[in-house]
């Protein structure tokens, strides 16, 4: 199974829509995605995500399933250092890196700054539980920190290279027909889902990775042993469609100008 997360185009937050540049990004994105075989499209209920999706959906004559729980993870806190009242990330390094709970996959919601807003803990659990329900509809059942596919043909492949050192070529042809789903959503909630899939604390992901607008984050399920699966990131923040279309990469959401190479 392949999951493609799409961050919305450059946002006009005052209108919960896109800037003119954001619409150009969305059109270039549509040209890229419309070449794919997509099992299902899913989308956040927020306007900037729906507007981004609209270009692809129109090009393909498709509709998206709206998932209320994949909205942005914008549950506000009061930053103890900068005093801003805003999203629960973008903390200064000297503050968040000394908080041991920020490195705890099960405990980061209990850090003092996160506990300011009790919705953060329940919202995180809600996203994780609903994402597991979505995966279960495709046959992936959460078991502790990985997924199992009951009834699926078992495979036993111990490595990615053969005994002679050549790349392992005997990949199951069935993998070519496995579903690809596309989810139009937001930087923060993408990091929430990746936190759950990869068992990495949310603060490490959201402070460590920048996902440009209309970027693709591609995650595939690796099913090489028995009927067990673990999700692995193939690409994160990919914007080849913008570079190929000579559209500059937006720095929206970053404290540094995005590299244009």
Which sequence ranges carry the predicted segments?
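Extreme N-terminal starter segment of soluble prokaryotic enzymes
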Residues: 1-4
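Glycine-rich N-terminal loop/short-helix segment of MobA-like nucleotidyltransferase
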Residues: 7-20
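Short catalytic helix/loop segments, enriched in acidic residues and glycine
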Residues: 18-33
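Internal catalytic-core helix/loop-beta-alpha segment
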Residues: 113-168
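Acidic, low-complexity terminal tails and accessory targeting/binding regions
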Residues: 73-91, 149-180, 192-261
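Conserved beta-strand termini and adjacent loop/short-helix elements that scaffold enzyme active sites
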Residues: 6, 67-69, 236
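Active-site metal-binding loops of divalent metal-dependent hydrolases
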Residues: 9, 187, 237-239
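Phosphate-coordination/substrate-recognition cap region in phosphate-metabolizing enzymes
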Residues: 30-118, 261
